Structure formats: C-alpha cells, structure tokens
C-alpha cells in the first residue's frame, strides 16, 4: 500500500514547497484546500489549477464560510495593512484558522489511512500568528492521537509535519528550488488586484519579496505596487 500523507495546500509559496517535500519524503500526497470566504480567492484558483500537475494524487477543496463569524481582514471588509510587517498579531489573523484546517485534514487522513499531515507553518518569517508556533503544533498532534479511533486503537501515530517551521523564507525558497518547484505556479498576496496581480505591499507579499531577495533569486510574479 502506498504511504499516504495529507498536505494542506493553499496555492501559496509555503504550502507548495510542503507538497514538494512530501513527495520527496516518499509520500503519495493528498492535497486539501479550503474555500472559507477568503477575500484573496485567487490563491485558491491557483491551487485548483496546479495541485494535480504538482503531484497530488487527489485534491479536495472543502467549502465553509468564516465570513459569517468575521474577525479578520482576510474575510471581512477591513483594510489589509500595507505599511510593513509588524510584531503584533495582525488584523489578517483568522480566528482559529489552522485549528480548523488541521481538524479537516485529520478527518480526511483517518479516512485515507494516512498518519502524516503536512502544514507549511513557519515560526521565523511569520506575521505573529499564534497558530504557527511549535507549541500549537505539538498540542494539536497530541489531540489528534487522543481524538481519533485510529489513534486510540493504536493503528498508528498521527504526526503533524512542519518542515518549514524553523526556516527563513529564503531557506524555504532555496529548498523548493532544489526540489524543482516553479514558484510562478504560486500566489501569496492577501489583497490582489481583480486579475490576480499581487499588491507587493501586504505582509505576505513583503515576506515573499524579502525571501527571494535574500535567496539571491528573482520572484517570477509581477506586482502592481512595484
């Protein structure tokens, strides 16, 4: 039987790198994306177009609407900050988003008989999100093995794999390039133009551009703000 893993895949730089890493680790990757009412929906279109070409065995898109709860510039009519990356938890934080995403991934993993879940969280070049920290990942992994039939019956041990967690954005990009990732097939912007062109000024764009610059590489995307 193939060794399966669920990969949380948004269409962004980090999750695309994770998908390549899961393949390199010998897993058959099953990609999971989310349509949760995000304003930056172009990223999801990128994910839909590229999951299979990038090597996903299946690509499951889960639909739910976090706009009904509110609380984030990524789902509400709140301006996305363009003044630079700060140290506080930003308004682009989506309440409990990674907990929600990982819960869906855990359910699918149990159905698939997969005990490995990849998520591209990063605790170095990140924007202050509490659900990108190692402490959060460890806590969710413990929960996964307590809250599932497979875990309780000892069929296997669920592992939340975070290969990017201690890497800078430049290191992530270099690792992806070494694995053959084409970053023109990714999208990172929180506030793109209607045609999908990245703004070049939001936190996500700034971190991406900084990563490419520090890696000594040219970002293949075009930006409206530059």
UniProtKB/Swiss-Prot annotation:
Gene name per UniProt: queC
Residues annotated to bind ATP: 9-19
Function, in words: Catalyzes the ATP-dependent conversion of 7-carboxy-7-deazaguanine (CDG) to 7-cyano-7-deazaguanine (preQ(0)).
Cofactor binding note of this UniProt entry: Binds 1 zinc ion per subunit.
Sample GO molecular function, one term: ligase activity, forming carbon-nitrogen bonds
Pathway given in the UniProt record: Purine metabolism; 7-cyano-7-deazaguanine biosynthesis
GO biological process: queuosine biosynthetic process
Similarity annotation: Belongs to the QueC family.
EC id: 6.3.4.20
Cofactor(s) recorded in Swiss-Prot or TrEMBL: Zn(2+)
Gene3D superfamilies: HUPs
Top-level taxon in the UniProt lineage: Bacteria
Catalytic reactions on record: 7-carboxy-7-deazaguanine + NH4(+) + ATP = 7-cyano-7-deazaguanine + ADP + phosphate + H2O + H(+)
Protein name as catalogued: 7-cyano-7-deazaguanine synthase
